[in-house]
Regions:
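Non-catalytic terminal regions with compositionally biased, polar/charged low complexity
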Residues: 1-110
Length: 110
C-alpha cells in the first residue's frame, strides 16, 4: 500500500505511463526507423560540438546549459543509448516490463 493508492494500482499506472513514453518519445517500434531519436539529432550534434570545443581549448564558456522537456530529453537519452535505452520492439510486440528494460524514470528522473 502507498499513501495514495494500492501498490498494484501504482505499478499498473507506472507501466502504463512508461509504455506511453516508450512509443511517443522513446525507442518505439523497430519499424519506425528511429524516428524519436532522430528528433534529437541537432541537440546531440551540438552537445558533441561543445565537447570538442572544450577539448580543443576553443570554448570560452564553462558550460552550455539548455532547458528542455521530456519530449526531447527522452529522445536525446535514447539516441545516446543510455542504460539500454535504444531497444525498440517489433511492431508485433507490445511494450511491458517483462520484454523491455526501458523505463521513463531512468531517462528523465521522474
Amino acid at each position: 500500500e502507498t499513501e495514495y493508492m494500492p501498490l498494484s494500482a501504482a505499478e499498473y499506472y507506472a507501466q502504463f505511463n512508461d509504455a506511453n513514453d516508450f512509443y511517443q518519445k522513446g525507442p518505439s517500434f523497430s519499424e519506425s526507423g528511429n524516428v524519436t531519436s532522430t528528433m534529437a539529432k541537432g541537440l546531440k550534434q551540438d552537445f558533441f560540438t561543445q565537447v570538442d570545443k572544450v577539448i580543443d581549448g576553443n570554448q570560452n564558456n564553462v558550460a552550455v546549459l539548455r532547458f528542455t522537456h521530456a519530449e526531447i530529453m527522452i529522445p536525446l537519452a535514447t539516441s545516446f543509448e543510455l542504460k539500454n535505452m535504444m531497444s525498440p520492439l517489433p511492431l508485433t510486440q507490445t511494450y511491458n516490463y517483462q520484454n523491455s528494460s526501458w523505463r521513463g524514470y531512468i531517462t528523465y528522473g521522474s
